[in-house]
Amino acid sequence: MPRVSRKQADLNREIIVEAATRLFRERGLHGISVVDVMAAAGLTHGGFYGHFESKEALAKEASGRAFEQSAERWKERIAAHDDNEAARRSLIEPYLSVASRDNPGESCPVAAFAGDMCHEAADSGLRQTFMEGIDRLLKSYGSLLDSGDAEADRQRALVEYSLMVGALTLARATRGDAVSDEILDAARTFLTAQGSSN
């Protein structure tokens, strides 16, 4: 069987990472196999180890990609608004939406991976990627809070982002029951009523 070109190998690797990024968000870091990822990428599973030394190496890269995608999406939403409150709402409203709840493969990696991180060693590379991603998103969200007190803004960012992640996680866990929509609505209403300078 002929070897693929370097360009094709790079393209295949990119396809694998994108497929894994989506699948890990949908099913969790430990809810899929190498065979699942390669099938989603449209490739045979035998080629996996030509690209990655282990499933864990792929998980680290794919989770990093998921955080990059979220951070870029937030950056674009923030840049589209002239004032902090409108920008803040542009993060909250889609995050706490039915679409976000029902499409985990395209939404927040924190809500998708938090449960898995409870079982990761504190010094694992995967956990480090997760912590860096959370820090990046928290800083982005916190940049929209302008009380004039940096420590108070940091604390508020921690509370509000935790509420967003928790509400999305609970809404997913209760999907199919009316309480799922209630959770999203209540959290979204509460957060948008706060304003960015309170």
Each PLM stretch: what is its role?
Residues 62, 87-91, 105-109, 156-160, ...:
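Residue-level detector of well-ordered alpha-helical segments, enriched
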Residues 68-72, 76, 89, 104-107, ...:
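Amphipathic alpha-helical packing segments from all-alpha helical-bundle domains
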Residues 19-26, 73, 77, 116, ...:
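Solvent-exposed, amphipathic alpha-helical segments
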Residues 61, 75-106:
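Hydrophobic alpha-helical connector segments
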Residues 15, 22-61:
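Helix-turn-helix
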Residues 109-114, 151-173, 186-190:
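Hydrophobic alpha-helical segments that form the core
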Residues 1-11, 198:
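N-terminal intrinsically disordered/low-complexity leader segments
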Residues 122-129, 164, 170-175:
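An extended, acidic
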